[in-house]
Amino acid sequence: MDKRIFGIETEFGISYSSPDSRPLAPEEVARYLFRKVVSWGRSSNVFLTNGSRLYLDVGSHPEYATAECDDLGQLIAHDRAGELILDDLVDEAQERLAAEGFNGTVYLFKNNTDSAGNSYGSHENYLIPRRGEFSRLAEILIPFLVTRQLIAGAGKILKTPHGATFAFSQRADHIWEGVSSATTRSRPIINTRDEPHADAEFYRRLHVIVGDSNMSETTALMKVGTVDLILRMIEAGVIMRDMRMENPIRSIREISHDLSGRALIRLANGRQLTALEIQREYLNKVTSFVAENGAHNQHVPLILDLWERTLTAIESGDTSTIDTEIDWAIKKKLMDSYRKRHGLGLDAPRIAQLDLTYHDISRTRGLYYLLQSRGAVRRVVDDTAVKDAVDAPPQTTRAKLRGDFVRRAQELGRDYTVDWVHLKLNDRAHQTILCKDPFRNVDERVDALLDSMG
């Protein structure tokens, strides 16, 4: 596919610190957080004027699903816009709590685990052609996704019986299957439930749920951009070496816990490779493919360069070449510097707090955003693009139709129903408009509906 639709769904961790007032359960805090949303949307599951979906997921985790994007920079801007939208809700919830005598602080974290060992996810969506065997696609992708944490992990302090250690991935220890139609019970690498949110005759949606939530824009670019490149190769019929793993679930944990990237992974055919060797195989294939076919977007040169530099950094043990671009390396540098300054071990409570605060989405409290304000991390998009994405949908996809409809209906106070493919005014006998093509940003039926609304 020359153009692909992308989306990222992010579940956020929520907590409330209250030294001087009674504690609140996450469920209670979430209700305060969504009170404004429920007041105008009559639900805690709404679509916004930027085409995105905002809702409370299982376990009172606020979740933001970006609108359909057809460009990686656009996707990152809309993913970051979700943080701003939720951060505004935090401020409003804070004011309401204070007015009711609660003097604590609400925190939202873009991470994947909490102190109780619960896990919540970051799910990627890729539109793929219906043709071809999905099982073959999964076989090719799973070895890549299991080892992708080397180039896209968020980093985490892992408590073990032998003490604390630093791991590549937050999500790796919470994945239990290779492929499955469930997302919460079994937590697979790839979710196989067939919900394309598009014309099912032509398209399928690849739903990847193994990845970490990323604070770094360049890491997010790597996470999605590398999968896009591999999908392009598969769609072009490139033959890939068989790297199916004997036990991908055991392997994903072993890889996360081994910062050298050299732990041997047993393949289904009995051979053994390291995570670095597996990643190199994919990188070499993609590099050759791009050399023959050209880069299909402006981000490809950076993706290939950073992919190469990250693997080289792991091989050499010198991460100074990537510690402004890859989440786990940025975080590790921060921790190592703090530990050295204060003479602390990895198991120190202050280091655990640092690990968590890195993921605080507050632009004034969060450690990642403190680094960003100092110019200590590399960016993909600028603040203007992110702020624009808070209100405006992507102009090149179906999200424009949805966002424009939601905006007009809200301005006029009309009762409406929307989802990823349907638009409907409830206070009129209009038929539901079905928008099955996610690439289509112009639709005469939607134009007529908007005009008829006044």
Curated annotation (Swiss-Prot):
It catalyses: ATP + [prokaryotic ubiquitin-like protein]-L-glutamate + [protein]-L-lysine = ADP + phosphate + N(6)-([prokaryotic ubiquitin-like protein]-gamma-L-glutamyl)-[protein]-L-lysine. GO terms for molecular function: ATP binding; ligase activity, forming carbon-nitrogen bonds; magnesium ion binding; ubiquitin-like protein transferase activity. It is an enzyme of class 6 (ligase). Mg(2+) binds at E9, Y55, E63. One of its GO terms (biological process) is proteasomal protein catabolic process. The active site is at D57. Pathway: Protein degradation; proteasomal Pup-dependent pathway; Protein modification; protein pupylation. It comes from the Bacteria. The keyword Metal-binding applies. Keywords: ATP-binding, Ligase, Magnesium, Metal-binding, Nucleotide-binding, Ubl conjugation pathway. InterPro entries: Pup_ligase (IPR022279), Pup_ligase/deamidase (IPR004347). Its EC number is 6.3.1.19. Pfam families: Pup_ligase. ATP binds at R53, T66, W420. PANTHER family: PUP DEAMIDASE/DEPUPYLASE, PUP--PROTEIN LIGASE. Catalyzes the covalent attachment of the prokaryotic ubiquitin-like protein modifier Pup to the proteasomal substrate proteins, thereby targeting them for proteasomal degradation. This tagging system is termed pupylation. The ligation reaction involves the side-chain carboxylate of the C-terminal glutamate of Pup and the side-chain amino group of a substrate lysine. Belongs to the Pup ligase/Pup deamidase family. Pup-conjugating enzyme subfamily. HAMAP family: Pup_ligase. The reaction mechanism probably proceeds via the activation of Pup by phosphorylation of its C-terminal glutamate, which is then subject to nucleophilic attack by the substrate lysine, resulting in an isopeptide bond and the release of phosphate as a good leaving group. This is Pup--protein ligase. It comes from Arthrobacter sp. (strain FB24). The gene is pafA.
